Amino acid sequence: MSLKTGRADGTATVRIDYEECTACGLCVRVCKGAPLYLESGTVHVDQTRLFGCIGCGQCVAVCPKNCITVEGRDLFPDDIMKIPSKGSRATYEQLKSLMIARRSVRNFKDRAVEHELIDKIIDAASTAPMGLPPADTEIVVLHGSEKVQEFANDMIDLMHNLKWFFAPFMRLLMRPFIGKEACESFKTFILPIIEIFIKKREEGEDSLLYNAPLAMYFHTSPYADPADPFISATYAMLAGESLGLGSCMIGTPGPFIKYSKKLKRKYGIHLRNQQGIVVIFGYPAVRYSQALKRRLANVHFYQ
């Protein structure tokens, strides 16, 4: 049975050049959709096995003879490229240094982010892993302070209209269904932050998206793993850091926009798509002199 996603239904087509194939079996070892199997010294394709070809491209990438092509489920023969040489890849120390140097930036220069950098950020985000191929992650790009402010104002208006939902009486009614932790979050964070957004806007200050010159909203289809847009957003954030941009993840809009058909239509978001996350970008207006050590809540090695 083929895997259905927001962009694919059915199996991808697998072609093997048997004149070049040595039946080494590497493609079979990495094939988890299971259409490939080795029998009598020959690699066979049976799309009725398990999910059939899901278009992950693992067999193409591992084949030492370049004798396999896969087409379908948003994968094309021209998508195959050489793996970057080891010398051109970041070392652990270089990657860790980039991560340590990154801070959540909320103060930006009055300077536009160039289209070239936006393209690079999106290109980096597209390399993120996904639950099921092809990726269902989508991005709403808000380029320019005016567009970002329009989005911020729309979100604050929506939050203002839904403020009653987080009032004490509603929290009391919902507590048996959403739990103590969610109710406490409504009381100590959601309702107060909505009040702050509204008050600061009245004072001419954007405390939601911080007057950023660029914002991206990552979201995904109802078929996808809910984590997919957050992983892509993380890749985008690190790419922005490598390009000299400051960034900050803004999680507040996601749960609200999920239930607003009006805003989904306005910003080109499919009505049934899951909630996502906003990342703001821009040239930092402040320079950080120190890094901060972070800690996980817990690491437990099971014995």
Model-derived features with residue positions:
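Acidic, surface-exposed loops and disordered segments
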Residues: 1-303
